[in-house]
């Protein structure tokens, strides 16, 4: 299945990253004991660890992250655990999209799955986005009948109202807030646009910048979410001027 293939590719990426970390730490340990020569690469890695920064060789083998080393390591372990649980227990009720190396690949896999089931071209499908009325993915009882439940996003530059079920102005001093789980529902591209929504760009990291991929899009950009605005005076344009975006991870 497309999701099975995607999982296999993600596991390969994580295994490679873990191997790089393991082998480099073993080599650094030997260098500190004086068993091997401390190379410039090892010295750079040692200094990075000393100052709570992600070593360059780990970053090169890893995923985009702005976190300091301690938080980055905790985040990586959570990602590995999510992958292990998926492997052992089958499809989760909700997918932690920010936990993937290549979240764009997960989105494509959902399109491919729907395309195969309904025997339709993949370019005739888009998503409707349905934020859930609760904040925890643990409250999702069973997988989505169509598409998938996805969780783990943060809103940058605005807040989320669970009462009004839409984006609202941030509270003073509150820069980023968690978004509820969202149901990604595949529909035909000819389906009408979701009313009273803001086309909110989703980025992997807070830099909102990356290198251009072969598709002409930034490698940091995942997709655009349609988030309810609640109507009234706060239209999508209002949130565009605010520079509101969704993020897959925080910087701390």
Predicted regions mapped to residue ranges:
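Long C-terminal appendages of very large multidomain proteins
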Residues: 1-252
């Amino acid at each position: 299945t497309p999701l099975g293939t995607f999982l296999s590719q993600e596991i390969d990426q994580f295994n490679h990253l873990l191997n790089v970390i393991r082998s480099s730490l073993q080599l650094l340990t030997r260098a500190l004991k004086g068993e091997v020569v401390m190379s410039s690469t090892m010295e750079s890695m040692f200094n990075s660890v000393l100052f709570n920064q992600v070593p360059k060789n780990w970053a090169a083998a890893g995923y985009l992250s702005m976190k300091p080393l301690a938080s980055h390591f905790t985040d990586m372990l959570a990602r590995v655990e999510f992958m292990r649980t998926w492997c052992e227990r089958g499809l989760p009720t909700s997918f932690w999209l920010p936990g993937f190396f290549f979240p764009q690949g997960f989105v494509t896999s959902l399109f491919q799955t729907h395309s195969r089931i309904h025997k339709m071209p993949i370019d005739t499908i888009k998503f409707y986005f349905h934020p859930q009325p609760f904040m925890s993915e643990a409250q999702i009882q069973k997988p989505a009948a169509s598409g998938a439940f996805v969780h783990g996003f943060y809103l940058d530059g605005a807040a989320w109202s669970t009462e009004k079920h839409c984006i609202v102005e941030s509270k003073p001093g509150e820069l980023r807030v968690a978004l509820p789980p969202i149901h990604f529902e595949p529909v035909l591209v000819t389906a009408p646009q979701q009313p009273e929504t803001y086309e909110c760009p989703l980025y992997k990291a807070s830099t909102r910048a990356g290198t251009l991929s072969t598709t002409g899009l930034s490698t940091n950009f995942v997709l655009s979410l349609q988030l309810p605005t609640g109507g009234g005076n706060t239209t999508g344009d209002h949130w565009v001027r605010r520079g509101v975006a969704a993020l897959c991870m925080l910087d701390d």
